[in-house]
Structures are given as structure tokens and as C-alpha cells.
Amino acid sequence: MDALELCNKINMEAESLADSGFPLEVFPQKMQSIIIDMVVHGNFKVDYVAMSMLSAASAALGNTYRIHVKQDWDTNAALYIILVGRPGMGKTPPLQLAYKPIREYERKLFDKFCYELDLYEAACATKESGSKEMKKPILKRVTLDDFTLEALVLEHYNNLRGIAINYDEILGLLANTDRYGKNPMLERLLSIWSGCHLENTRVKNDRPQRVEEPCVNIIGTTQTKRMKELMASKFMDTGFLDRILVVYPKSKKVPHWLDEEDSHVRQSEASRKWADIIGKIFGLDYARCNDTNECCPNILYMDKDAHSLFFGWWNRNVDAINAIEDDEDVETRVMKHNTHVARIALLLQALRYACGESHLQSIDVDSIEGALRLNEYCENCYQRCRAFVAEDTCDSMSKELLYLLEDSFDTKTALKTGMENLHVTDRTVMNYIKELMKSGLITKAKKGFYEKVKFETGQATET
């Protein structure tokens, strides 16, 4: 154990960060130190800081590196992330801080564009020799916060490395998903996540745009009371919610401000170190194809141990899915976990490289292990959100029946309990069971048998 690792462990214990349940130790030691300083001196939640940084790292890496999953399947590291919490928990500030180096990078791109535009306009005005061959400069952007579908395609076409969508209130983005007629935003966001190409071939365009391998990150915030809107059937049934990593801290307490003279100095130093890491990731470039010399993404393969761990984990999921008899009982969200884990592993490998703590020749077992833990954390967050949404949406009589039943029960027991305790008919009890299943509070184990859905914090039905 080196000095930095020891220091991080001491600081984590001193600040009780282990109690948060967030697996901070999966990140590089240098990054852990930065996150701890931001949490302590910026009064932020460790969950929000770390996952915002993961999103920013993905935006910087873009399409330059991809991870090989199996056969012809490889993927970039694009993530859809939502930071959930009550008002005043400080969701937006750490997101802005994590993306500050990205904004600075964009400012440099803007300054370069303005300089080149001045040269172009001057050449055109004086009609210098060769000015007709001079291409008009194009402004490259990395982040978007308000856009149309056409604008998204155009901006990504101008910056094939990748685009990051930042929305302070994520439902503001999703509210636009119904206004595009035959080509809705929601369907595009689904296909983008899956790696399907983007194109804009409207007649009014001087030149059609096509992005063969889109890399679009999405990160935003929302309040806990609005999760009910996000878990509506429109987003659940389409599979959009399956593609989202949910970040929801266990503790709802707002951190106290610390009256320390050097807090701003410590936070500024942490921000500078983070900017250095993002700068190194931005410095990574495409590979060159041997036959055409065109830019091609670098493909990283898992080493033997990483491959064994990843495939073993996924095959256990497959075994559990294959054991389910009723198609309606299959949890569609699980089917996206392999993509989430692969993408997070690629990011952790790149971050460890940028921190000088590993290589970037392959994906090692540490990155896979870290990705599995982060995916599990985000899934627990999602399940806890689903628990309180289910409590709100399920009617009181259905919940009362559930409180009276054991963790596992059969139809006969439910009917008897309903008749003896609630004085309702068999048909009414079956309607209650349908309501409980619809709300996600119970699942069908097999025909005639049901189980209560348990969440990380206990049963979804706890009071």
C-alpha cells in the first residue's frame, strides 16, 4: 500500500464515506484523492461527484477508444446518467465542476474557430489568390443543453469524436420526445445508445450528414418526487429507462458548510488535478487504418482474467433469465447490464491510464471488477427509486394485502388472507395482485406463486 492509498483510506474513514455505500475504491488512487477533497471542501455527495466525473471522462474519450465485447461486438463508453435527490442536496454543482475542464476545452475550440474565421473572412474580402479553395472553418462543440434532432446530428457530424448532453433537469429533455412527429426524439435516443447510425438527409441541407458510430453521453438531474414521471410506461415500455444509470445517494442529509480558511484552495487544487486528468484523456487520439490511413477507433480487448470474470458473471445472469418460464417476468433492464459494465470498464481503464496507475493496451480484471461494482451500485439506486415510486402509485388496499402476506406466498394464501382480513372477494384479491405486479412490488416466481420484491434498503413495502 503506497502513501496515497493509505491517505485515501484514512480520509474515507474520517469522513465516513464508506457509509455512503458508494464504491469509491474502484477509481484510481489519484482520482479518489480528488473526489475526497471535492466532497469535503465542496460539501458534495460522493455519489454525485464520482459519477459526474465518469460522465465527463466518457465525453473526453469519445470515439477514440472502444472495448471489444465478443465476436463483432465492440462499443464506445457512452453513458446515460441521472442524478436523483431531493431539492438542495447539491446535484448540479458537482456536475458543473466535473464538466469544467470540458467547458474550458470548448472555449479553446471557440477561440480557434474565431481566429480561423477572421482569416477566412479577410481572405474572402481581399480576394487573395487561392481564397476560393479556403474552407470555411467549422465550430466544434462537445456539450449541448438545448437542441433539435437536426442540430444534434449536425453537431455530432462536425465533431465525430462525440457529444455530451447536459440537462440540469433531465425531464426537460424528455419532455421534447413527443414533438417530432414521425421521427421522435425518444426513438433516436434509444438507437444512439445502441450504436445505430445517425443521419440528416433533409432536402434543405446543402450536404446530408451521417454519423456512422455515434457517441452521445447524457447526464442530468431530477428530484425524487419527479421520478414517478420518469418511470411512466412511455419510458419503461420502450426500454429507455433500461439504458439509464441511476445515482441516488442513501443519505438524504444536506452536508453542513465547513468554515475553513483553505477550503477554496483545496477545492481549486482538486479541480486543477482533475483538469489534468481530463486533458490527458483529450490527448488520446484515434488509430490509423493501415489500408486507408483514415482515423479508426482503438479497440481494447479484455485480458484473460478480465474476459473470464466478465463472461462468467454474464452467463450467471443468463442462467437466471433462462430459468424464468413466463416472458412477462423477465426483467428487461438486466439485458442492458453487459453493455453498461463493458463501457464502465473501458472508462476505468482510461482513467487509470490518465492517472499514471495502469496501461491502455487492454482491459484488465481490476477494471472489470470495478465496473461490476459500479453497475451494481447504480442498479441498487434504481431499485430504491422504484420502491418509493411503487409505494406512491399502488393503491392502499393492494398494499394492505401485501403487508399481511409473507415474503413468498401462493394464490390460495392470498385469497384466504383477502377474505379473512380485508373481507373482499377472490376476484378483488386477484385484481390487487395484478396491481402489485404492475407497480413492481411483487414478481411471479412460477405459476400460482409470488415473491415480494426486495430492495437494498429492505422490502419495498416497509413503512
Question: Model segments located where?
Answer:
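Phosphate-handling catalytic cores of nucleic-acid transaction enzymes
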Residues: 1-463
